[in-house]
Structure formats: structure tokens, C-alpha cells
């Protein structure tokens, strides 16, 4: 067995829960920028992200509203107008 006297404390990297939570929150916020992608936040994460209760739209209305974001994410040279100019 391991002798506790021979194991040095420097051999173990401590976990930094605050840093891990912040990294997870940053990843979720980046995912939230993807149109149509629904990211779930726990109450603590939502508060840190500056969230507030949404009372202006229903969840269904919010999900349907992402259709107009398609044009914002498509590069300009692949749109119909740019394709028609090349005829």
C-alpha cells in the first residue's frame, strides 16, 4: 500500500471549482449564440449570466423567432441575390 508519509502533496493538482464553473458558463454562453440551439442554465449560472425572467414571449414564440436569423448567419456571397448577379 501507499505510505502516506511518502506521497507528496505537490503530486496532486487541486481542483478549482470556481474556475471550472466559469469555464462551463463561458462554453454555454458561446453555445447560446448558435441560432436555434437551446442551452439550459441552472439558476446560479443564469444569475451570473445576467438572465432575467422572460415574460415578453412564450417559449413557442421564442423558438419560432429564430427563423429570421438564418439570413444573418449565411455568408453574403451565397445568398440568392448574389447568385442571380452572376448570370
UniProtKB/Swiss-Prot annotation:
Residues 76-87 have a biased composition (Polar residues). Keywords: Plasmid. This is Protein TraD. To plasmid R751 TraD. Residues 67-87 are annotated as: Disordered. It comes from Escherichia coli.
